[in-house]
């Protein structure tokens, strides 16, 4: 029997039933990813597995470095076949890592290859995969369509023109809805060059910015621009969740320092972060948006490699922080007190905080008619694993209502990462099936069908209301 077979990851009979009868064929609602809208719009031809597999994939790059592979085969200019062979050498030694599962799933799902990839057959599989891509005229749009994706939300800078989203919408024959999502990370980097650069770009698009009010007004204009283009989600990447009380005068002083390139203290940065989250949440709430917050990554930790290959290259890790429970609750409470807490999804990168997040969101489920208004987001990045998914779902089941979980997202730059939805659905089905067979969940097919289909698709569809 092939390693990737119909019962892969399904370790109980109920789980097999739940996956095959309820989960497997549900469409995909990918509400957070990093796909390039230009590549979708241009319907780029995909004719080389190395480009699909290794381009921009820092998960694989980390593993290759752990294997001792030279950088020229990772982020360098080595030939595609040579890079593929080096990845294969790494993959053979990645047993136990989800990369092994994902890669074999992708070979099966997108190339119809069931063989285990090894150094002995690497070159043959490389050519088989490339031939398959060419014979099937594979493109970015065909990969999305074949993956049964109904909706994609990309990740977009506040100053992006979103023209590619318009172009995608105008295309005939491509039925997946592709919408922008507002990602204003640089607004929190007060005192950094990225903040100054954002101010200049915003001024070019809106109006002169000399005060915090000018800044907020400019951002609100861009939020409305995204709204007019169909965007209904925002996402924020924060190193820490940290609340500090502030006054209008304090924010004005901090902003003036930023304009004058003066030093800004850590305390002032956190005051400004609290201010920005609060001001942005007003605009999101007024427009019925969903606010996402990803927190807990410490980035670019290897200075030598950052200077050599740049950011997002596989040198980030999980961080910890003091007093998270207070800071998280205080941030949400600020918005709740002022009457503008939007639908919110919290993604913690450090899994030891699962129960803190779970117990926090339960404090703010106070808007009648919205099921689990504040969500505990799916296992993210370093938790995008069997163990990470199970820990997140177990904590959510303990602390909240798993039945209303909005489920999986790819959070990926790869057009063949939709295998991760299948991976999640297998793990979910096996997890629920195991609880059924232990007598902890009723063996009621109507109940189980509703739970599986809700988590796989229906909850996201009803929560985001985008299509």
Swiss-Prot record:
GO annotation, biological process: D-galacturonate catabolic process; D-glucuronate catabolic process
Reactions mediated catalytically: D-glucuronate = D-fructuronate; aldehydo-D-galacturonate = keto-D-tagaturonate
Coiled coil: none
Pathway recorded for this protein: Carbohydrate metabolism; pentose and glucuronate interconversion
Pfam families: UxaC (PF02614)
Family matches, as InterPro entries: Metal_Hydrolase (IPR032466), Uronate_isomerase (IPR003766)
Record carries keyword Ribonucleoprotein: no
Protein name per the record: Uronate isomerase
Lineage of producing organism: Bacteria, Bacillati, Bacillota, Bacilli, Bacillales
Gene from which the chain derives: uxaC
């Amino acid at each position: 029997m092939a390693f990737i077979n119909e019962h892969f990851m399904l370790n109980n009979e109920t789980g097999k039933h739940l996956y095959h009868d309820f989960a497997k064929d549900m469409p995909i609602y990918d509400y957070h990813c990093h796909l390039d809208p230009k590549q979708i719009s241009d319907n780029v031809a995909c004719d080389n597995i190395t480009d699909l597999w290794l381009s921009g994939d820092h998960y694989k790059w980390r593993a290759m470095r752990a294997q001792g592979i030279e950088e020229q085969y990772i982020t360098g200019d080595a030939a595609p076949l040579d890079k593929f062979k080096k990845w294969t050498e790494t993959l053979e030694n990645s047993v136990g890592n989800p990369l092994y599962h994902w890669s074999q799933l992708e070979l099966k799902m997108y190339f119809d290859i069931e063989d285990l990839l090894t150094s002995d057959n690497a070159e043959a599989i490389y050519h088989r995969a490339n031939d398959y891509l060419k014979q099937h005229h594979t493109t970015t749009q065909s990969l999305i369509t074949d993956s049964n994706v109904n909706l994609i939300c990309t990740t977009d800078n506040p100053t992006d023109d979103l023209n590619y989203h318009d172009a995608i919408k105008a295309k005939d024959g491509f039925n997946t809805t592709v919408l922008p999502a507002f990602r204003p990370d640089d607004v929190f980097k007060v005192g950094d060059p990225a903040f100054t650069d954002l101010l200049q770009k915003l001024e070019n698009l809106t109006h002169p910015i000399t005060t915090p009010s000018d800044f907020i007004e400019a951002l609100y204009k861009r939020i409305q621009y995204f709204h007019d283009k169909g965007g209904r989600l925002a996402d924020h990447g924060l190193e820490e969740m940290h609340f500090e009380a502030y006054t209008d005068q304090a924010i004005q002083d901090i902003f003036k320092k930023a304009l004058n390139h003066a030093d800004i203290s850590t305390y002032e940065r956190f005051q400004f972060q609290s201010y920005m989250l609060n001001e942005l949440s007003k605009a999101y709430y007024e427009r019925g948006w969903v606010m996402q917050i990803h927190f807990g990554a410490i980035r670019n930790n290897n200075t030598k490699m950052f200077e050599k290959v740049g950011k997002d290259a596989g040198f980030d890790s999980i961080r910890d922080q003091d007093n998270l429970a207070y800071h998280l609750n205080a941030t949400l409470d600020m918005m709740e007190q002022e009457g503008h807490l939007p639908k919110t999804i919290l993604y913690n990168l450090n899994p030891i905080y699962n129960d803190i997040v779970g117990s926090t969101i339960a404090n703010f489920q106070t808007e009648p008619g919205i099921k689990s208004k504040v969500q505990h987001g799916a296992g993210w990045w370093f938790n995008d694993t069997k163990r990470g998914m199970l820990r997140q779902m177990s904590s959510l089941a303990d602390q909240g209502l798993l039945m209303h979980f909005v489920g999986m997202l790819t959070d990926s730059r790869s057009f063949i990462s939709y295998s991760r939805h299948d991976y999640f659905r297998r793990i979910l089905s096996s997890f629920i099936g195991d609880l059924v067979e232990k007598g902890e969940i009723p063996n009621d097919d109507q109940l189980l069908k509703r739970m599986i289909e809700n988590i796989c698709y229906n909850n996201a569809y009803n929560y985001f209301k985008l299509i």
